[in-house]
Amino acid sequence: MSLIKFYMRVASLESGQISPNEGMVGIVDDDSDISILFADALRGVDGGISVFTFNDSLEALKHFTNNKEKYILVICDLMMPGLNGLDLVKKIKKLSPKTRTMITSGYEIEPGELQIDIKKGIIDRIIQKPISMNGLRQEVKNQINSCQLRINKK
């Protein structure tokens, strides 16, 4: 596990930006180059977030379980040894339904393949790799804003 902590300019929800509340973002990919690249890309995300990278899904699940109230987003590769990405996000959503989840894959995902899991709210977004770092930052901003708006409505 690696911790990469960023503190950046904080914007208000009124401006449509990320809430000032700090939260954890987990990146889970068995390819360490991808997880580090994704973590580096998140330096451009407004707000204070702590980014944790994992190359082992079971290690990620253990960390999430111990910190579930702090996680706002988990980005997870679909195809991994051991516990695959879909099974990991199912466990994450069971532990913390409010945590947003994004599945990434370098393999082509057939239309409708994961639609049931999206409709059930298990997967919040599917990202096809490769993705530009600007595209990743925007997707993360969207997911974090969605999570914060949902929390603030309660």
PLM regions and their residue ranges:
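The C-terminal output helix
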Residues: 141-154
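Acidic, metal-coordinating helix/loop segments flanking the phosphotransfer/catalytic sites
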Residues: 53-73
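Two-component/phosphorelay signaling modules centered on CheY-like receiver
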Residues: 32-52
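Receiver (REC) domain active-site loop signature in two-component systems and cognate sites
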Residues: 80
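C-terminal output helix
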Residues: 2, 128-140, 144
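Hydrophobic/aromatic residues positioned on beta-strands within the core alpha/beta folds
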Residues: 104-106
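Active-site residues of response regulator receiver
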Residues: 77
